[in-house]
A protein has these predicted regions:
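Conserved N-terminal glycine-rich FAD pyrophosphate-binding loop of Rossmann-like flavoproteins
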Residues: 41-74, 80, 237-241, 250-252
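N-terminal Rossmann-like FAD-binding beta1-loop-alpha1 element of flavoenzymes
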Residues: 12-37
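Glycine- and aromatic-enriched mobile tails/lids
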Residues: 1-3, 8, 19, 31, ...
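Glycine-/small-residue-rich beta->alpha transition segments that form the dinucleotide
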Residues: 192-194, 198-203, 380-381
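Core beta-strand elements of the Rossmann-like FAD/NAD(P) dinucleotide-binding domain
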Residues: 7-10, 185-194, 370
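Conserved redox-cofactor binding core of oxidoreductases
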Residues: 45, 98-186, 198, 242-246
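An anion/pyrophosphate-binding glycine-rich loop and adjacent beta-alpha core
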Residues: 222, 228-341, 399, 408-415, ...
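Dinucleotide-binding Rossmann-like beta1-alpha1 core, especially the glycine-rich loop
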Residues: 74-101
C-alpha cells in the first residue's frame, strides 16, 4: 500500500529546529505568522546548539568597557579579510539584545554582583563571552527556546520530517517544500508563503566531528538544487583540541577549550615538549594561537612524527593543583573521574576535529537569499565569519540571524497570497519519496557514508594539495555512481516504518553534492587563508581576497570567484 501524502499549509515554514530555527519560529509568530517548524530529529534536541557547552559572544559591557564595534573588530580580524562586513556588523550589534532577551526568558546566564558575567576566549580582546556554565550553555539555550515555544498556538512543530527538496510556485518564488516522515514513510508537502532554512552546517562529512548526525549539509544541498548560490564553501573550521583519548562518554569533545585558556593548560607533543612557539605563538604555556594556527601546529607535529600515540597532541594540567582544578572545572571534575581521567596525574590526548563551516547560502541583511520567498539563518548562512570564525560567535550567529530571519519571513508572508506548489516539481519529489523504480535493495549506505567521511578527512582536511583534492573529487564521483539516482525500497514494503538505509540514502544525496562543493572550491582557491591551507600554495595572496560562489547548473557544480564587495545586497 502506498501512503497518501500529508499536505500542510502555513504562512512560514522553518526547516531545522536548532537555536536558529526555534528563534526564527518564535520571532515569526510574534510577527503574526502561523509557523510550521520541522526537523529531521526531535524538535530542539538535534543540531549543534544543544551540544555546545561553552560560551556565547556579546558585547554587553557590564563588567569591562565594551561595544559592538570592538566585537566587530575582533570578528573581522579572525576572518582574514573575507568577512561580509554587513553581516558581521549586524551580528555584533544585535547580539546584546538577544542575550538579554534570553536572560529575560530564564536561560540562567552566570551572574556576578547582580549582572551577567563574561569570560575571555581566544581572539577576543576583552571578556565578552557569556555562559550558563562551561558544560551546559548550549543545552540551556535550547531548553529555553523550547520552553518559550511550548503552548504557542501559532507554532506547529513536527519532528522526524526529512525535507528532500524546496519547491517553487508558478512564478518561480519558493512556495514550500516536499519531504517524508522517517517513522512512517508518509510523504509530506508543505505550502508556505515564506520558508526559512535553519539546517546548520556540514561537519558530518568528516570522520571526527563535534556536532550531531543532523549536520550533513542538508540546507546547502536544498538551496543549490533550488537555484541559490553558496559562498566560501572551502572554509571548514577544525577545532584544534577536540578530545581524542582516553575514552570520554557523555561530554562534548571540545569541552577542553575554556579550561585550557583559563588554566594555561600545556599543549605537548608525543615527546612531552611544548611546541606552539614553532608556529607563531609567542608563549607556549598559554593558549594564544587562533584556532586555524593551533590546528596547523598540531597537524605539523603529527606529520613530523612527534604526535601522541593516537595521532594528536597531549593537553596537560599536571602543573595545576587539585584545588585549582576543582575551582576551575567544578562538577566537570567528577564527570571526568567517572571516565577514569585524573588531570592531576595524567594528560589527555587531543586532536583537531571538524567543528564549524564558515561558508553557506548567500543572504542579505534581512536574511533573504537570492530566491524570493527563501530566507536563511544560523550556520547555513555563508560569509559572516570569512575564512575563520571567531570563537564563541556560533550560538551568537544562531540567535541573531534566527531572530532576523523569522522577522523578515513574517513580513514577507503578510505581503503575498499563498502560491500553489509547482505540480511537476511536487510530482518529481513525491516520486522520489515513493516506492516506484527503487534503487538497489542491498546498497550498504552506512559503508558509503564511512567512505565519504574517510575521503574528506584524508584529502579535504585543513591542509590540502591539488593531488589530494583531485583524489577526493574522483572518490566522491565513484560514491555518487554507487549511490544511484533512486533510494532503496522500504524494507518489507512501501510503508513499513522507519528504515535507516533509506534515510541514509537521502543523507548521502545531500552529503555528496556538498562534499563536491567543498572540494571544488578548495581546489580553485590557490592560496592559503584562514581555515583553508594549501600546502602547494602556502601564501595568503591579496588577489584572493574574494569570495567564491558555487551554483548547480544542469546537475553540474560551477565555482566562480567574486570580489569581496560584490556579495548579494
Amino acid at each position: 500500500m502506498t501512503l497518501e501524502p500529508v499536505a500542510i499549509e502555513t504562512d512560514v515554514l522553518v526547516i531545522g529546529a536548532g537555536a536558529a530555527g526555534m528563534y526564527a519560529a518564535i520571532e515569526a509568530s510574534r510577527g503574526g505568522a502561523r509557523v510550521f517548524l520541522v526537523d529531521r530529529s526531535l524538535i530542539g534536541r538535534g543540531g549543534a546548539t544543544v551540544m555546545a557547552q561553552m560560551t556565547v559572544a556579546a558585547a554587553l559591557g557590564e563588567e569591562v568597557p565594551d561595544s559592538p564595534r570592538h566585537h566587530y573588530n575582533d570578528t573581522i580580524a579572525a576572518g582574514r579579510g573575507l568577512c561580509d562586513e554587513t553581516l558581521a556588523q549586524l551580528l555584533c550589534e544585535d547580539a546584546p539584545a538577544c542575550i538579554r532577551e534570553l536572560d529575560a526568558w530564564g536561560v540562567g546566564w552566570a551572574r556576578k554582583d547582580n549582572h551577567i558575567t563574561a569570560t575571555t576566549a581566544p581572539g577576543h580582546d576583552r571578556a565578552r563571552c557569556v555562559y550558563v556554565d562551561f558544560i551546559n550553555t548550549g543545552p540551556a539555550v535550547s531548553k529555553t527556546l523550547r520552553t518559550v515555544m511550548a503552548g504557542n498556538k501559532d507554532i506547529r512543530k513536527a519532528g522526524d520530517i526529512c525535507i528532500i527538496d524546496l519547491v517553487a510556485g508558478s512564478d518561480g518564488e519558493i512556495a514550500g517544500a516536499v519531504g517524508w516522515h522517517v517513522g512512517s514513510g508518509a510523504p509530506v508537502t508543505v505550502a508556505a508563503k515564506a520558508t526559512v532554512l535553519a539546517t546548520g552546517g556540514l561537519t558530518r562529512l568528516y570522520r571526527r566531528n563535534s556536532a550531531s548526525l543532523n549536520m550533513g549539509g542538508d540546507g546547502y544541498a536544498l538551496a543549490l538544487r533550488a537555484g541559490a548560490s553558496l559562498i566560501d564553501m572551502e572554509f571548514v573550521q577544525f577545532f584544534p583540541i577536540g578530545h581524542l583519548a582516553p575514552r570520554l562518554v557523555g561530554m562534548d569533545p571540545i569541552m577542553w577549550d575554556p579550561f585550557r585558556y583559563k588554566l594555561g593548560g600545556r599543549l605537548l607533543n608525543g615527546r612531552m615538549e611544548e611546541f606552539t612557539s614553532r608556529y607563531g605563538s609567542d608563549e607556549d604555556g598559554k593558549y594564544v594561537l587562533p584556532r586555524d594556527l593551533a590546528t596547523y601546529a598540531i597537524f605539523k607535529e603529527v606529520e613530523a612524527g612527534r604526535g601522541s600515540p593516537h595521532g594528536g597532541a597531549y593537553l596537560s594540567f599536571e602543573h595545576c593543583s587539585a584545588a585549582a582544578l576543582r575551582a576551575a572545572f567544578g562538577p566537570v571534575i567528577d564527570r571526568l573521574a567517572a571516565n577514569a581521567i585524573d588531570l592531576t596525574g595524567m594528560p589527555v590526548e587531543v586532536a583537531p576535529i571538524a567543528h564549524y563551516h564558515m561558508g553557506g547560502v548567500v543572504a542579505d541583511a534581512q536574511m533573504r537569499t537570492e530566491l524570493p520567498g527563501l530566507f536563511a539563518a544560523g550556520e547555513v548562512v555563508g560569509g559572516t565569519s570569512g575564512a575563520n570564525r571567531l570563537s564563541s560567535n556560533a550560538i551568537t550567529e544562531a540567535v541573531v540571524f534566527g531572530r532576523r530571519a523569522g522577522r523578515s519571513a513574517a513580513v514577507h508572508a503578510k505581503t503575498i497570497a499563498r502560491k500553489d506548489l509547482r505540480a511537476a516539481s511536487v510530482r518529481a519529489a513525491l516520486d522520489l519519496v515513493g516506492a516506484g523504480n527503487c534503487g538497489a535493495p542491498d546498497l550498504n549506505t552506512a559503508a558509503l557514508i564511512a567512505r565519504l567521511q574517510a575521503i574528506m578527512a584524508d584529502e579535504v582536511g585543513p591542509f590540502r594539495t591539488a593531488a589530494k583534492l583531485d583524489r577526493a573529487l574522483a572518490g566522491i564521483a565513484v560514491l555518487a555512481d554507487e549511490l544511484g539516482e533512486r533510494p532503496p525500497r522500504f524494507a518489507g514494503g512501501t510503508d513499513a516504518g522507519f528504515d535507516l538505509q533509506r534515510l541514509e540514502w537521502f543523507d548521502l544525496r545531500n552529503m555528496l553534492v556538498v562534499a563536491r562543493a567543498v572540494a571544488q572550491s578548495a581546489l580553485a582557491r590557490t592560496e592559503s587563508r584562514g581555515a583553508h591551507q594549501r600546502e602547494d600554495f602556502s601564501q595568503m595572496l591579496p588577489d584572493w581576497r574574494r569570495h567564491q560562489r558555487v551554483r548547480l547548473a544542469g546537475g553540474v557544480l560551477q565555482v566562480s570567484g567574486a570580489p569581496a564587495e560584490a556579495l548579494a545586497s
